[in-house]
A protein has these predicted regions:
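Catalytic phosphate/metal-binding cores of nucleic-acid and nucleotide-processing enzymes, i.e., regions
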Residues: 1-104
């Protein structure tokens, strides 16, 4: 499962259901990872009908709080209320379902 770090503010907004999208810059680093999980074709275009589970972790430690989110992808401008820079184009992860991971 692809794991992506996320800031606490956005983590909490996704967990509460307030934030419905997560944004990642249009960089080769993310393109490769999204291709591997099936959200992007090797041409760089989103596979609209595909959804996959991604782990969003609030920090870099394996013990940091994390969520599993079922996502689909599009390439678009983001919502500035949810952390996107105005007018900038992103990989937009549309969040369909959220599961909080419990640590023992």
């Amino acid at each position: 499962m692809l794991t992506l770090p996320i800031k606490r503010k956005w983590f909490n907004m996704i967990l509460s259901g307030e934030k419905k999208e997560e944004y990642r810059e249009m960089k080769q680093y993310y393109r490769v990872r999204f291709e591997r999980c099936g959200l992007l074709k090797n041409t760089g275009f989103p596979v609209w009908e595909n959804r996959c589970w991604i782990r969003l972790r609030n920090g870099y430690s394996h013990t940091s709080p994390s969520l599993q989110v079922l996502c689909s992808m599009r390439i678009s401008k983001g919502n500035s209320d949810w952390g996107a820079e105005k007018g900038k184009v992103y990989y937009v992860l549309k969040i369909w379902e959220v599961k909080k991971e419990e640590r023992n």
